[in-house]
Amino acid sequence: MMVTAVKKAFLCVALSVCLAGAARAADFYQVRGGIPNSQYFLKANVVGNQYLFFIGDSVLNGAGLKDSNLRYSNQMVQALQKHFPDANMHETRHMQPGGSWFGLYRVSHGQAVFGEVIASGHLAILDFAADDRDVPIETVKTSLEGLVRQIVLYRATHSQILVYTLTPEMLAAYQAGKTPEYIRVSEQIAEHYGIPSLNLAQYAAEKIIAGQISFPAISADGINPTDAGAKIYGEAVAKFVDALVGANPTPDKPVKRTLPAPLFAETNDNGRIVAYEDVAVKRSGNWKPGQASPIGPFRHVLISNEAGATLTMKFKGSEIGLIDVVDKDSAEYQYAIDGAAFQKLAAPKAVAGPTMRPVSLAKGLDRKAEHELVLKVASPGVARVGGFLLNGVVEDPTAKLSTLERIDATYAAMDPIVYQPPAGRFVNIPHTMAKLRDGGELRMVLLGDSIMGNTSGSSFELLMMRDYPKCKIIKIASLRSSTGCKYYRLENRVQDYVLKYNPDLLVIGGISNGGDAEAVRSVVQQVRAGKPDTEVLLLTPVFGSPHDEHIRTYTREIDTTTSNFRFNLQKVAAEEKCAFFDMTGPWWAYIQNSGKTYGWFMGDAVHANARGCQIIGHLLEMWFKE
């Protein structure tokens, strides 16, 4: 009996020790509300490519690694892939300086200069520990919280994860038995918003403190991990992801989040980059918009080499700053807020080459009051402006315009397109043209990828209905990211993506057909087999990367001497009795003749912005117009 009691007591103690050890092993991460919405999207797998956005600093770049695949961001994607093997995940890393302060502006509503909403998709992983080392903790509080709130405001179904990597300051705190102040504040924010967090700093520090490895072995420079350090991070990532995915069942549909009140009263969640071409920015003097930037992520910059050239902007907000490109030839600026004395923003003296410079000009402003910034070139040299960093709002004179009025305003600010469509182009779409001319309802299905999303976003059907007022066009965008006819032709997908919409006219386009005109033919034939009276219009590619074939090997007219997608698609159109529009030719000719860099028309590295969409929209209007 005594032995049994002792055994029981021993087992209880052992179990307690094991549980305590498990608790200690797990306290380097917190699951909180988890990422159930991302689990839904990863499992549903209906959007094509799924981009996981890692936003942070040099650690994401893999600096210091011999094997770049060991970076923790890649290991996190691979760990998620094990749970969702069919999801086409892409690790998308955004490494820029400025820590969470600049992150507040980067993770905004989409900027014409930066070109993309870098927290799009459904999951943002935020890692600013290294760049926030020297930032006052009060700034971190409001910047990180504002950033977290903006992501939810942008997309209420978005999931987030906070990650903390090891720094010398954090290690010193852990060695002293303390929680680093940065992590304490970040965890306050994570707890307030129910965001999962992964404390790689603690996981690595515990191994150093236990004597299992030295800090130099983990990181040669104190910030960026070595291969050995990255493997330790990878251990933690694997445990975290397993716990994260296992904590919540995958929901039947994503749930929109409602933001609580800010944790810190000073937090402002209106961070944005006001691009220099915004109507709120007034120019005087000699400025050249739409010029090529010597560095990314700018798509284009505003350039002046005239001392005295001035930019003025009225705004409401708590902080205003500047983002520009500086180099050895840069001019200095002077700036004034609300009529105060001008202050100097010096030209940099120690840059090795073109460098992005985000800088605050004034903070702590009355966010409800109207302010005015005046910025002027104040010395010989070159000014290369991207935009203004504003935690606040500017007046949008287009906000009350209708969609048609807005696209008219966009196009009015562009050089007009000169294009003469070919005769005989309507021969294979007689019923479509009859409905346009004579009236009735025209059901038009757009099939393709996100470039066809740009096509839909141009609202070209409104331009067409203005030309053909008797006809009501029902436009249906049936799209999947990075997806073309090589996908749609399989497994009877034409039923779900085309036939169920009962189209009168099917429009196939985009840049994701993989150069395979025969895949397009297969889709056309399957659609006609299911609904023989469907008319079809085939479009050649527009937009995309400069490395894509239709740009890299561009000719104004289709090259009929070699096998290329434009030529092959033209042959498919003729043989399958489809209408055909070689949009590539006039689209790229317009951009080449515009006097602007390609980025002037880009919304990101691949897609069109509002100007680019109106090239598409007005070309389609011209093609359909008799």
Predicted regions and their residues:
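N-terminal secretory targeting modules
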Residues: M1-I55, V59-D67, Q78-M89, I118-A119, ...
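Catalytic His-Asp segment of secreted/periplasmic serine-dependent ester chemistry enzymes
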Residues: F28, M170-V274, G544-E626
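Loop/turn elements at helix/coil->beta-strand transitions in domains of secreted/extracellular proteins
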Residues: G48-Y51, D86-H90, A119-A124, A156-I161, ...
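Oxyanion-hole/transition-state-stabilizing segment in secreted/luminal serine hydrolases
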Residues: F54-I55, N61, G103-K141, R437, ...
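Active-site-proximal beta-strand/loop segments in catalytic clefts of secreted hydrolases
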Residues: I55-D57, H94-G98, L126-D131, Y164-P168, ...
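A short beta-strand-loop structural module common to alpha/beta enzyme folds
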Residues: D86-W101, K470-C485
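Active-site segments of SGNH/GDSL-like serine hydrolases
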Residues: D127-D131, V148-R184, G510-I511, R528-R566
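Charged helix-capping and loop-helix junction motifs
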Residues: T139-G146, T179-I183, A517-V523, F565
